[in-house]
């Protein structure tokens, strides 16, 4: 179980969503990607009309991600967001998921 406070949780997830949104803003002219962030939920739509949806699950202190392939639940562990089922680290996962759906590699983290 996460040791985050609700305040820490919201700050961490808001930072992730902002970082993704800023990167999408940089590349939106090069790739046919639309996105919208509203109330802790970020929808990303690709040229093929598929989507990735990221949203807060505050009661569980998790970040949930839905792709056209599956749903993923990330919990904060040892300074990283880790998927409960597959053990993937969030930034590695989201870069692969976007590449699969956009057809182009996108680097979100440093």
Language-model-detected regions and their locations in the chain:
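N-terminal intrinsically disordered, cationic/polar leader segments
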Residues: 2-110
């Amino acid at each position: 179980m996460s040791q985050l406070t609700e305040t820490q949780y919201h700050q961490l997830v808001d930072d992730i969503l902002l970082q993704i949104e800023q990167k999408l803003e940089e590349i939106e002219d090069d790739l046919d990607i639309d996105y919208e962030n509203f109330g802790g939920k970020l929808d990303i739509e690709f040229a093929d009309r598929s989507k990735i949806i990221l949203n807060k699950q505050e009661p569980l202190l998790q970040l949930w991600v839905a792709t056209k392939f599956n749903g993923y639940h990330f919990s904060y562990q040892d300074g990283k967001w880790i998927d409960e089922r597959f053990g993937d680290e969030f930034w590695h996962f989201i870069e692969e998921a976007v590449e699969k759906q956009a057809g182009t590699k996108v680097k979100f983290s440093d």
